[in-house]
Each structure stands twice: as structure tokens, then as C-alpha cells.
Regions:
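Auxiliary Fe-S-binding modules of radical SAM enzymes
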Residues: 129, 139-198
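Conserved non-cysteine loop/helix-boundary elements of the Radical SAM core domain that shape
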Residues: 1-157
Length: 198
């Protein structure tokens, strides 16, 4: 990830290269909670970023450990609260369903926890194993984990989004997706990621 100074230089270059006078949204994938710092958030605000995405993937620590994510559930909460406190009023959160070993109850727990944070939009990704992902490299280790109750999982996530006042605004599929499911974005009115629907 970029250091704050590098991020500042990059965003200066972006600002110098494009006309922002009619800009309606400036989104940055802030990414993993362990890579987000107060200094980086300050740089984003300085350059007029209006929407960020924080990507916990799951709120179950055992799953994060299993898939090789280096952040903790507590870091997710702290990072989200920090971004809110610093003034970000349009925060998306990304979750992945179909992660190894996750049951309906694990996904239900993640959805309950995200509702406590109350982001402005929510993206539910179905697991798609990338070529260099740990799940692909160590496929034998994860071969016994399967996704269950696909339709019920998507209904559970949709209900959580609805409880937060969100509606679906985009859907797409990708290669090697688990369980024949889709990726779905939910948002409150006026908080949809414009770049997702152009």
C-alpha cells in the first residue's frame, strides 16, 4: 500500500490531470482496515475524496485467520469509527460470502455486526478464487469447505441491507464465482457508488 506522502503525490497528480469542476463523486478503495491510517484518511479528505470503501470481508476472526487476512475484527470497527469521526459521510463496506468454513450463522453474525456500524452502502461479493489468492495456491487445504444455502445467504444479506435503509443498485457476475451467485451492491438513497453503474 502507499504511504501517506505517496498517496498525497498521487492525488495531486490526479487533481492536476483532470477537470473536477463537474465531479459528483470521488471514490477511493481504502481497502483492508490494517492498511488505513489517520494520516491516509486526512490525505483523502484534503483532496476531496467523497466516498471510501473499507473491506472487512467477514466479521468472523476465525475466517480472517484461515484465509490469511492480517487485520482483526476490532480493527474493522476502529477504522470505520475513525473514518466517521474524521468526517467521511459516505462509507461502503465489502463482504465476501462463500469463504471457507463459513456457515449461515457466521454470515448472519457478520450482517448483525455490520448493522451496528451502519455504513452508507454495502457490497456483497460471492467468493471468486483468483489465480494468486491463498485459497487457490493452497487449494488442497480448503477443498472440504463448501458454500451452503446460496439463496438463503443472499436473502439474509438483502434483509440486512434493507434493515439499514438500503436497496440494491447493481449486480454482476464474474469468472470462477462460488455457488453460482452474484455480487450485489446495496446503498441508501444518494449513496450509491456512481462508478459502479456507469
Amino acid at each position: 500500500t502507499l504511504e501517506p506522502e505517496q498517496l498525497d503525490r498521487l492525488l495531486h497528480a490526479v487533481r492536476d490531470s483532470f477537470d473536477f469542476s463537474h465531479n459528483q463523486e470521488f471514490t477511493v478503495e481504502a481497502g483492508r482496515p490494517d492498511s488505513i491510517t489517520p494520516e491516509k484518511l486526512a490525505v483523502l479528505l484534503k483532496h476531496g475524496v467523497t466516498r471510501i470503501s473499507i473491506n472487512p470481508q467477514t466479521m468472523n476472526q476465525k475466517t480472517l485467520d484461515l484465509i490469511g487476512r492480517y487485520h482483526t475484527v476490532e480493527q474493522v470497527k476502529e477504522t470505520f469509527q475513525l473514518a466517521r469521526k474524521m468526517g467521511f459521510d459516505n462509507i461502503n463496506m465489502d463482504f465476501i460470502v462463500g469463504l471457507p468454513g463459513e456457515t449461515m450463522e457466521d454470515i448472519r453474525f457478520s450482517m448483525e455486526e455490520v448493522q451496528k456500524l451502519n455504513p452508507d452502502s454495502l457490497t456483497i461479493h460471492s467468493l471468486a478464487i483468483k489465480r494468486a489468492a491463498r485459497l487457490n495456491i493452497m487449494r488442497e487445504q480448503y477443498k472440504d469447505f463448501t458454500i451452503e444455502n446460496n439463496e438463503q445467504i443472499m436473502e439474509l444479506c438483502a434483509a440486512a441491507a434493507e434493515n439499514m435503509g438500503m436497496t440494491p443498485y447493481y449486480m454482476y457476475r464474474q469468472k470462477n464465482i462460488a455457488g453460482n451467485m452474484e455480487n450485489v451492491g446495496y446503498a441508501r438513497t444518494g449513496r450509491a457508488g456512481i462508478y459502479n453503474i456507469l
